Amino acid sequence: MKSYRVPLVVSAALLLAVLVPCSIGETQGIQVKESVRFQDLSAFDAGLSGLGINARLYTVQYITTADSGQFGGTIFARNVGNKQLGSHWVPGDPRRYGVNDIFWTTDQVDESSWVPLKDSTAAIDRAMNTWQGVSCSAIPLTNVPDYGFDWGYVQWSLNLGGYPGWLADITHAGWLPAPFFDSIAPPNGSEYILGATFTFIWTEDGTPTDIDRNGNYDVAFREIYYNDAFEWSTEGPAWYDPEVDVETIALHEVGHGLSQAHFGKMFVDASDPEPPYSISHLHFAPRAVMNSVYWDTQRELLSSDVGGHCSIWASWPR
């Protein structure tokens, strides 16, 4: 599915309006927010329960296209009222290999229909290395082979391939067809979700754990999925191109994999008082990789991305 945004021929003033991040003080438009909601996704827990594994789905975070009238989203799969907490890895977690490494792998089975496997894998590798290179932290992000398995517990739960378990802490589980994304955001999530990160947390007697008492639920594993219904590219598409940049979305989703939430405010001009809003009037404050809407190729972390990362990972044991 191609998702065209705006005509190529635009004025210089419009280019400045949409491409230059506005400060909050400069923005005079209407603030729009990502969708944050509870949704019953307990069906994804059935397989884990049947296997005797005390891990349960906690959140699904997704990034959307800019021309969809959607502004990203976070789904909480556990309704704990006003006590929604963050989630993070536990150093040396005995339930997770007992080491400080964060293991990751890239599924080599569910490849993109648009980009050769070697190119999409290389783009994901670069995204992982970008986060690894942030100097304030010393996370040992350790790549492990996929061993030829079709990894993906969530897709297995939906009878779309996959595997009833996991190997790595963070799994890039591949490009999935439209029904996968419609199932997590019915009825038409596949029309606007580009990528999604699923976070599973450890539980004990059905209650989320926080064994290191840091105010975050303990992460068991995370899976990242990409929407094959969109046209993908590794050529660095511009904001007006129909393609979606693999590395940009991977960089964003890995941010979720490393416990970052969406960041930044979004505004539309008051000339669009009601949705759906015109894409040409969307502003970010500030612009960040972790904005909940995809705009164009952004392969470098910006200051807010680095700041968020350092606040989470600077104290990780070296």
Each model region followed by its residue ranges:
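Bacterial N-terminal signal peptides that target proteins for export
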Residues: 1-11
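Bacterial N-terminal signal peptides
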Residues: 10-21
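Ca2+-coordinating acidic residues in Ca2+-binding motifs
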Residues: 22, 253, 305-308
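Disordered inhibitory propeptide/activation segment of secreted metzincin zinc metalloprotease zymogens
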Residues: 22-116, 190-217, 269, 273-281
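Metalloprotease/metallohydrolase-associated module, dominated by Zn2+-dependent proteases
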Residues: 28, 220-234, 244, 261-318
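A generic structural signal for short coil/turn motifs at secondary-structure boundaries
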Residues: 111-118, 233-237, 297-299
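Metzincin-family zinc-dependent endopeptidase catalytic domain
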Residues: 120-251, 257-277
